[in-house]
Regions:
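Short glycine-aspartate micro-motif
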Residues: 78-82, 165-169, 187-189
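Predominant activation on well-ordered alpha-helical scaffold segments within soluble catalytic domains
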Residues: 23, 27, 44-47, 116-124, ...
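A short glycine-threonine-serine/GTX helix/turn-capping micro-motif
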Residues: 13, 177-178, 197-204
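Buried hydrophobic positions in well-ordered alpha/beta secondary-structure cores of metabolic enzymes
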Residues: 33, 50, 68, 81-84, ...
Length: 234
């Protein structure tokens, strides 16, 4: 029923015409360095584009997420659409985009500048075609998704300070795949302290912190975990 609405059909048609513009935007964002914990420059540009495309209520929250609210009629659930802004590549990486035919090469252009491109294009299609929703939509660029970032941006989004009924994460380039569900994640920092000593003179009678952590890692590697729900550890 939604797909049959004239304004939605018009949005689909416009999205097809909008490909070149969306690609230019993807390239622009990719060429703004955004390693985990240092997404601020890309975040400022994402916030600027959200405002350009019609959002009045756009903030960069204390942790660095960009959150833009598109009000609905007030009678429905609040849906957040998010794409992480950080890249797995370290600071100083050459992020200049190189084109070969129809293929674009650059660190982070897929993961996750493609997600940011889609997020902003969806916003444009809603605004340009005057699509109204019952509930509010939150357009979110999150920080700290990769590695030691520990998904901190998404976790902060759900810290209870905002009412959110649903969340759609847009990540990478596999547009033909939809995953439904939520994966729990826990991270621990384990510190092993020892008395110290000389590796030769004190061998055998002073405990080695390195040996202790290696033994702990070996035991963890032998853990049996459930297959359903799928459970992993590193």
């Amino acid at each position: 029923k939604l797909a049959a609405k004239p304004e939605v059909r018009a949005a689909f048609t416009e999205a097809e015409r909008d490909v070149d513009r969306a690609m230019r935007e993807q390239i622009e964002l990719c060429e703004i360095e955004a390693p985990t914990f240092h997404e601020e420059n890309r975040a400022r540009r994402v916030a600027e584009l959200m405002r350009t495309y019609g959002l009045k209520d756009v903030v960069i929250d204390p942790i660095g997420n960009v959150v833009g609210r598109r009000p609905g009629r007030g009678n429905g659930p609040v849906l957040a659409l998010g794409a992480h802004m950080d890249s797995v590549f370290p600071a100083g990486t050459d992020v200049k985009v190189r084109q070969e035919g129809r293929i674009y090469h650059a660190p982070g252009i897929g993961d996750n500048c493609s997600g940011l491109r889609a997020l902003l294009q969806i916003l444009r299609m809603y605004e340009d075609n005057h699509i109204e929703t019952e509930g509010d939509l939150l357009f979110v660029g999150t920080v700290g998704e990769e590695g030691n970032g520990d998904i901190r941006g998404s976790k902060a989004l759900f810290d209870g300070s905002r009412h959110i009924d649903g969340f759609i994460a847009i990540d990478s380039t596999d547009v033909g795949r939809i995953l439904k569900g939520a994966t729990g994640s826990h991270r621990w920092r384990i510190c092993v302290d020892g008395t110290g000593g000389h590796s030769y003179a004190d061998f055998g009678h002073v405990p080695s912190a390195i040996h202790a952590i290696c033994r702990a890692g070996a035991k963890i590697a032998d853990f049996k975990v459930p297959e359903d729900p799928k459970t992993t550890f590193t």
